[in-house]
Swiss-Prot record:
NCBIfam families assigned to the protein according to its UniProt record, in alphabetical order: rplT_bact
One of the GO BP terms on file: ribosomal large subunit assembly
Cited InterPro entries: Ribosomal_bL20, RIBOSOMAL_L20_CS, Ribosomal_protein_bL20_C
Official protein name in the record: Large ribosomal subunit protein bL20
HAMAP family reported for this sequence: Ribosomal_bL20
Family assignment from sequence similarity: Belongs to the bacterial ribosomal protein bL20 family.
Record lineage: Bacteria, Pseudomonadati, Pseudomonadota, Gammaproteobacteria, Pseudomonadales
């Protein structure tokens, strides 16, 4: 049986990691051993922050809705309670967009919530 040397496999593996580490600072983009650790850590951060991004955007939407609601004489919690009672099923993302870009439409939604309280 012929001897199998692993040069091709190792080079492919190293190249894959070093390509993923492109743009990293110093040895992190040049030295395989350091680059591998950097890529693994980057993956961990990416995994964590894909989940944190959802939290951050929801918090941003709530802050924007609250500001818009208070400009129309209602608190965020009262607005959401009113919308639930009125069976208005607009999600926070759309409400935040209305509060920022369509003040008249948002005011109409707030009035509907006020009426149901």
């Amino acid at each position: 049986m012929a001897r199998v040397k692993r040069g091709v496999v190792a080079r492919r593996r190293h190249k894959k990691i070093l390509n993923q580490a492109k743009g990293y600072y110093g040895a992190r983009s040049r030295v395989y051993r350091v680059a591998k650790q950097a890529v693994i850590k980057a993956g961990q951060y990416a995994y964590r922050d894909r989940r944190n991004r959802k939290r951050a955007f929801r918090a941003l939407w709530i802050a924007r809705i609250n500001a818009g609601a208070r400009a129309n004489g209602l608190s965020y919690s009262r607005l959401i309670a009113g919308l639930k009672k009125a069976n208005v099923e607009i999600d926070r993302k759309v409400l935040a967009d209305l509060a920022m870009n369509e003040q008249q439409a948002f005011a109409a939604v707030v009035e509907k919530a006020k009426a149901s309280l």
